[in-house]
Amino acid sequence: MIIVTPRYTIIEDGAINKIEEILKKLNLKNPLVITGKNTKKYCRFFYDIVYYDEILNNLEIELKKYTAYDCVIGIGGGRSIDTGKYLAYKLGIPFISVPTTASNDGIASPIVSIRQPSFMVDAPIAIIADTEIIKKSPRRLLSAGMGDIVSNITAVLDWKLAYKEKGEKYSESSAIFSKTIAKELISYVLNSDLSEYHNKLVKALVGSGIAIAIANSSRPASGSEHLFSHALDKLKEEYNLNINSLHGEQCGIGTIMMSYLHEKENKKLSGLHEKIKMSLKKVDAPTTAKELGFDEDIIIEALTMAHKIRNRWTILRDGLSREEARKLAEETGVI
């Protein structure tokens, strides 16, 4: 297996001004930029630009329109980055990630989530994260990023469980890397004034994405908490719910509950879910169904169907009954 990780990673104030320098180092001369209408202002150069929604509205794109380019640069939030990764993968050319916020580990991972189920592509060849820009992004997006990082804790616990109970392939190095990233950010959040939170968060999200690339699987960063989040997404669509909850917010609440389930089976983990909850509260991320915008019944239904979302063995095993789901949500304070 060939492990592809970024050749260049720049995380600093003013990093966006180094795009041309990185292009030269990579011997890339004709990039196509994918961005959004709100982030076009950061494209301060004379490259061709396409808005991400033009691609998303037609995923079966005519690739011959873009064959003259030798790389794709995604500048913006999750949709710009994911769309850029997808297009670069389809074209067979490198992708450079230039995030303008830090709401999930998609900024560095080889995973695209523009449709479900998500799928693996090539990891970015370079990541250029301008912390000056990211610091000014909406606070809510940065809070959601914390939710995506804490999910590494339960993702790794689930992965190890699948290894023990189902003989699933397991990478100790990738698991330790992913878990350590999450624990260090939690420790920083709980023991600081958060003055460097945006900087620490970006580095954690980049590390999480690299852990996925090393494992060649989303396992180090996606477990039962992500199944719960995807179940919520499915119910939002099924019931036509006008709820604008973010992926990281949903994963954060999922992590509170799933870590509690792991605690019940392993006394060494005692207090884990409370620690995770406190870290989420510290960055103003939601920790209850009400704060997330969901009725109790939707949370319970999502918990009962989460194990069916994809073929992935987790602490949910063969599923929770409605009674078990309600008890879990109540005991963790989610409802």
Curated annotation (Swiss-Prot):
User: What's one GO MF term for it?
Assistant: glycerol-1-phosphate dehydrogenase (NADP+) activity
GO CC annotations, alphabetized: cytoplasm
Where does the chain cross the membrane? none
Describe how the cofactor binds. Answer: Binds 1 zinc ion per subunit.
KW Membrane (keyword) present: no
Give the enzyme's EC designation.
1.1.1.261
**Which pathway, metabolic or otherwise, does it act in?**
Membrane lipid metabolism; glycerophospholipid metabolism
Pfam families, per the entry: Fe-ADH_2
This molecule's function is given as:
Catalyzes the NAD(P)H-dependent reduction of dihydroxyacetonephosphate (DHAP or glycerone phosphate) to glycerol 1-phosphate (G1P). The G1P thus generated is used as the glycerophosphate backbone of phospholipids in the cellular membranes of Archaea.
Q: Give the UniProt family note.
A: Belongs to the glycerol-1-phosphate dehydrogenase family.
Q: What is this protein called?
A: Glycerol-1-phosphate dehydrogenase [NAD(P)+]
Organism of provenance: Methanocaldococcus jannaschii (strain ATCC 43067 / DSM 2661 / JAL-1 / JCM 10045 / NBRC 100440) (Methanococcus jannaschii)
